[in-house]
Amino acid sequence: NGVFSYGTGTTVNISESMITTTADNSGGIQTTGGTTNATNLVVSTSGNSSAAIRSDRGGGTVNVDGGSYVSNGYNSPAVYSTADITVKNAFLTANNSEALVIEGKNSITLENCTVTGNMSDTKGSSSEENVHNVMIYQSMSGDADVGTSTFSMTGGTLTAKNGDMIYVTNTHCVLTLSGVTIQNKDADGALLRVVGNSASHGWGTAGSNGAQVEFTADNQTLSGDIVVDTISTLNMKLTGGSTFTGTINIVDNAQNGTAVSNNAVVTIESGCTWTLTGDCVITSLTNSGTINFNGYTITLADGTVLR
């Protein structure tokens, strides 16, 4: 690793520096306990499993302001979090991986960042389950405590070159987007996928390893499809004048797990708009805003069909 903070009570301060790593398993800045404060760094990693900003067992706190953080290997996000990581005013680029990963009871908070991921397939990836730009999960490996994962992004740009924008599995997640420009270059990629997984990597037990997501979009423009499987839950709220153009649908769990209730609960506050691009199936809807049906329908769990 280029810079390494280890152990509770350790503090590393670094600024105006260039860090380059070339080997596998070699991150740019790594925190395993303690605190790392980084300002205006230029970080580049070339190896596989070499996130530009990363943490490991032991958690810790990472504060980054300014700079450029680029990874080039497989399984090498720009940021991999098993800690509490805050990044402001930075460029975060993963050229052969998803852009961001949060594992377990940890967080990534971004403010005014330009984030780009390019996970073209699952080769060499930590996920054989899905191609995506942001992954939020619990591996059950012991690297991260079980608990709520938190992803918050305010301002900036979030770009996916392939796959789904956000993929959540086997964890509880609080997700907040506010004023982010979201660009998915893959027309077939979902905006958000909240599902179980095959457990081939040990991520929980197949059929009972869904995700639970609380998603707030505030002053946010959203576009794309949202998919929730029958062993997962999504509580989604549009607020602050947000607009969503797309669909929300509940699908069967691929591993035939026992279904849970309240799979997709949607709240649209006053001043917000949902424009449908296809038929939708959700659990319930609280609407104080506007829905443009465009000839499509919303089917609720009680059998009500809105049109």
Predicted regions and their residues:
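Predominantly extracellular/luminal carbohydrate-interaction, adhesion, and secreted-enzyme modules
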Residues: 1-7, 27-33, 50-57, 74-82, ...
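Generic structural motif
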Residues: 8, 58, 105, 118, ...
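Short "repeat-start/strand-capping" segments in structured domains, especially the N-termini
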Residues: 8-11, 33-37, 60, 82-85, ...
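Clustered cysteine/histidine zinc-coordinating segments, centered on FYVE zinc fingers that bind PI3P
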Residues: 130-143, 147, 155, 163, ...
